[in-house]
């Protein structure tokens, strides 16, 4: 791929789902977003289901794919477009059986090309590397170097997602390095001018990074 797009992740808790739905609509109207990952770690099934039921129509009305974190069983039952798996979650082959051949399945690979290649061979639709920067959204067991994005971009067809502490101030370098998607949570939801401005700022940084990527390749 020679493009890079925003992969938006929900905050870790949604205390007021209706209010967040308005924030999500504003964010998605702020610029290009490829996918929304609903990530509610350790939340009860009914809370996750309620979030999917409220947020999915908002995303899909704007052609944004809906990915559920960790739970292929719920993702299949709730009709999500895909699921994101951690290294300690359900095996990819089992998730594929639940989700079907058309679902998007991504896998966290930390800072390891070996894990990413295993995921690719198992049929992952994308691999996620990180964390690239300090993050308070989730515990990050590894720190990744942007070089892994460049190597992956040059050698593999499956898209890569960069994750971990990404904001408008540091996104351009990851887009330039070769990331196909930038996974962002707090960089949008905690943007000082609001989530719509956060999405717009990330997209502007991505455009800057893609210009640098093309220039480095002599384009």
Curated annotation (Swiss-Prot):
Pathway in which the depicted protein is active: Cofactor biosynthesis; thiamine diphosphate biosynthesis; thiamine phosphate from 4-amino-2-methyl-5-diphosphomethylpyrimidine and 4-methyl-5-(2-phosphoethyl)-thiazole: step 1/1
Binding site for 2-[(2R,5Z)-2-carboxy-4-methylthiazol-5(2H)-ylidene]ethyl phosphate: 135-137, 165
Coiled-coil portions: none
Gene3D superfamilies: Aldolase class I
Classification via Pfam families: TMP-TENI
EC number: 2.5.1.3
A GO MF term: magnesium ion binding
Cofactor notes: Binds 1 Mg(2+) ion per subunit.
Record-linked InterPro entries: Aldolase_TIM, ThiamineP_synth_sf, ThiamineP_synth_TenI, TMP_synthase
Keywords annotated in UniProt: Magnesium, Metal-binding, Thiamine biosynthesis, Transferase
Catalytic reaction list: 2-[(2R,5Z)-2-carboxy-4-methylthiazol-5(2H)-ylidene]ethyl phosphate + 4-amino-2-methyl-5-(diphosphooxymethyl)pyrimidine + 2 H(+) = thiamine phosphate + CO2 + diphosphate; 2-(2-carboxy-4-methylthiazol-5-yl)ethyl phosphate + 4-amino-2-methyl-5-(diphosphooxymethyl)pyrimidine + 2 H(+) = thiamine phosphate + CO2 + diphosphate; 4-methyl-5-(2-phosphooxyethyl)-thiazole + 4-amino-2-methyl-5-(diphosphooxymethyl)pyrimidine + H(+) = thiamine phosphate + diphosphate
GO biological process: thiamine biosynthetic process; thiamine diphosphate biosynthetic process
Entry keyword Calcium: no
Residues annotated as binding 4-amino-2-methyl-5-(diphosphooxymethyl)pyrimidine: 37-41, 69, 108, 138
Top EC class of this enzyme: transferase
Disulphide-bridged cysteine pairs: none
Domain of life: Bacteria
One CC-aspect GO term: cytoplasm
Needed co-factor(s): Mg(2+)
Cited function: Condenses 4-methyl-5-(beta-hydroxyethyl)thiazole monophosphate (THZ-P) and 2-methyl-4-amino-5-hydroxymethyl pyrimidine pyrophosphate (HMP-PP) to form thiamine monophosphate (TMP).
Family: Belongs to the thiamine-phosphate synthase family.
The protein's name in its UniProt record: Thiamine-phosphate synthase
Naturally occurring in which organism (per UniProt): Caulobacter sp. (strain K31)
Phylogenetic lineage: Bacteria, Pseudomonadati, Pseudomonadota, Alphaproteobacteria, Caulobacterales
Gene assigned in the entry: thiE
């Amino acid at each position: 791929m020679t493009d890079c797009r925003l992969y938006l992740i929900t905050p870790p808790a949604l205390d007021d789902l209706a209010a967040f739905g308005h924030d999500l609509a504003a964010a998605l109207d702020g610029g290009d977003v490829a996918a929304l990952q609903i990530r509610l770690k350790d939340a009860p099934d009914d809370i996750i289901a309620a979030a999917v039921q409220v947020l999915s129509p908002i995303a899909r009305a704007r052609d944004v794919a809906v990915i559920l974190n960790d739970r292929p069983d719920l993702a299949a039952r709730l009709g999500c477009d895909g699921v994101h798996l951690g290294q300690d979650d359900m095996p990819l082959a089992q998730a594929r059986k639940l989700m079907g051949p058309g679902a998007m399945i991504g896998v966290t690979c930390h800072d390891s090309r070996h894990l990413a290649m295993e995921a690719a061979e198992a049929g992952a639709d994308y691999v996620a590397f990180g964390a690239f920067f300090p993050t308070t959204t989730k515990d990050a067991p590894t720190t990744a170097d942007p070089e892994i994005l460049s190597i992956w971009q040059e050698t593999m067809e499956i898209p890569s997602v960069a994750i971990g502490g990404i904001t408008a101030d540091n996104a351009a370098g990851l887009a330039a390095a070769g990331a196909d998607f930038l996974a962002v949570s707090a960089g949008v939801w905690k943007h000082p001018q609001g989530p719509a401005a956060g999405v717009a700022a990330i997209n502007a940084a991505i455009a800057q990074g893609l210009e640098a990527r093309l220039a480095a390749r002599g384009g």
